[in-house]
Amino acid sequence: MFSERGYDGATFQEIAVRADLTRPAINHYFSSKKLLYCDVVDQTNELVVANGIQNAKRALRLMDRLSEFIAVVMRASSEDPSVSPFLVTAVLESQRHPELSRNENDAVAISRVFLNWAVNDAIERGELKADTDVPSLAETLLIVLVGVGFYAGYLGNYQEMRAVIETLRRLLEGAFWERGA
């Protein structure tokens, strides 16, 4: 419901109907919409962002790490199509409603830390040039991941996403550039 209507548009009544519960049942566990919303954000971040980072850290190369992270998002979205739209919506809502943003479980902040680590690690292993501007590259990769999340959530389907992710991977690895052109 939050991914469809946003924080302001979602009501307890609509959430209860969608969850096949009564409004009092939801109010028993969550005394406010803010508490419910923050719990959904926490669970979604754990399911997608934390698991994506955990899987990505097992890979050895930067592109493999990004691919693993994206694969977790794709799997979660194929199992529950509201996941990607909700993650995108949560980022927007945290800008509209700063009181909903909590740094310890902010998907953008957590992803940014991971990407800075991954870029630094790629430099240390000689995969990237030593003079790489880490914050700029990490932020660029964050933009790519947010774009992929937006596309997965609102525009593409699972099959399209697999092809797009493979093309993105090849693009970032330089597979499309003509040598000497």
What name fits each language-model region?
Residues D80, A130, V134-A138:
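Membrane-interface starts of transmembrane alpha-helices
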Residues E4-D8, R58-A59, D80, R125:
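Short coil/turn segments at alpha/beta junctions that flank glycine-rich nucleotide-binding fingerprints
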Residues D64-R65, S78-R102:
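Amphipathic alpha-helical segments used for helix-helix packing
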Residues E4, R18, L35-R58, D64-R75, ...:
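Alpha-helical structural segments
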Residues M1-L35, D39:
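Helix-turn-helix
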Residues E68-R75, R112-E124, E139-V144, L155-A181:
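C-terminal peripheral helix-coil segments that are non-catalytic and often amphipathic
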